[in-house]
Design a protein with these regions (language model features):
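Short N-terminal segments immediately surrounding and downstream of signal-peptide cleavage
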Residues: 23-34
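Extracytosolic low-complexity repeat regions of secreted or lipid-anchored proteins
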Residues: 33-38, 46, 50-98
Length: 98
């Protein structure tokens, strides 16, 4: 009985589909004259552009967009660099230069 239960459990675990791989898109979309969206994961480039355009605050080391994305600088300095914005499974990267 235990072997049958263990065998059934193993078969069920093998048949459960794995998590779908993340779809990463390469973008070359400008949200503004000094904001270039370079890539987007699990979202369209147009959606990332719209989210970044709705942010009217300063581009600091860390900030949050109105769409709920948490953004953080991953390289560069306050005047030029690359930021990564994340919300659950969605993410995008953008480059800023002043």
């Amino acid at each position: 009985m235990r072997t049958t239960l263990a065998l059934v459990t193993a078969v069920v675990l093998l048949l459960v589909p794995a998590e779908a791989p993340a779809k990463v898109r390469s973008c070359h979309t400008r949200a503004d004259f000094n904001l270039l969206i370079s890539s987007a994961r699990n979202m369209r480039c147009k959606t990332a552009r719209r989210d970044l355009r709705r942010h009217h605050g300063s581009i600091s080391f860390r900030f949050r967009t109105p769409g709920g994305f948490r953004c953080r600088r991953v390289s560069g300095n306050a005047l030029a660099g690359q930021w990564r914005c994340v919300k659950q499974r969605k993410a995008y990267r953008f480059e800023f230069s002043d």
